[in-house]
Amino acid sequence: MEIRRVTRLTKDDVSGRDFSFEIFAEVAKPYEALALGAEITTNPIAVTKKDFGFDESEFENIKEPDDVLFTVVEDERVYGYVHAAKSWNNMVEVRFIVLDVSIRGHGYGRKLLDKVVEWARELGVAGIRLESQSNNVAACYFYRQYGFKFGGYDEYLYKGIAQNKDETAFFWYYMLD
């Protein structure tokens, strides 16, 4: 498998991939403790499967140099991707990072983030920001292990989305200075 920089991604490119993940716990409060470097502790919740889907319009025309899209490719099939963009606050925002279930745990998430960090350094931005959810515990562990710092949370961000109303948005930062 190789990491490639591309300027578009289609449904055909990701056809047959399973980007879903299992929700089995949520990060325990108080969330403020995460900002102080506390260990991530969890509470069990009912097991469900979550899939963000794929909206081709999000990936039709990646506008370089302010957007970047890296893919994990084997035999011309995409098994994962990360989309990031330069934001108004001189930060890079990771908009999507997903991996097919068949390649999780093999270092490809780290390789994709390494490419984003390299790109962000080329841009000369202050750091990288991304959002996760309180019930995506595996992602929280991964971002913390990579070196992201917990920057805050928003308990109201998803209240207007019925299926996500109980989730809390977490914001993670990887500073480059």
Language model features with spans:
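Extreme N-terminal starter segment of soluble prokaryotic enzymes
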Residues: 1-3
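Acetyl-CoA-dependent GNAT
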Residues: 7-9, 16-95, 100-102, 113-114, ...
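Short secondary-structure boundary/hinge segments and terminal tails
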Residues: 32, 94, 121, 138, ...
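Residues within well-ordered beta-strands of beta-sheet-rich folds
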Residues: 73, 129-131
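Conserved phosphate-binding and hydrolysis motifs of nucleotide-dependent enzymes
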Residues: 76, 80, 107-109, 147
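Structural preference for beta-strand elements that scaffold enzyme active sites
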Residues: 91, 127-129
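Conserved acetyl-CoA-binding loop-helix of GNAT-fold acetyltransferases
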Residues: 99, 105-122, 141-145
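C-terminal "cap" of GNAT-fold acetyltransferases
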Residues: 126, 133-137, 146-149, 156-177
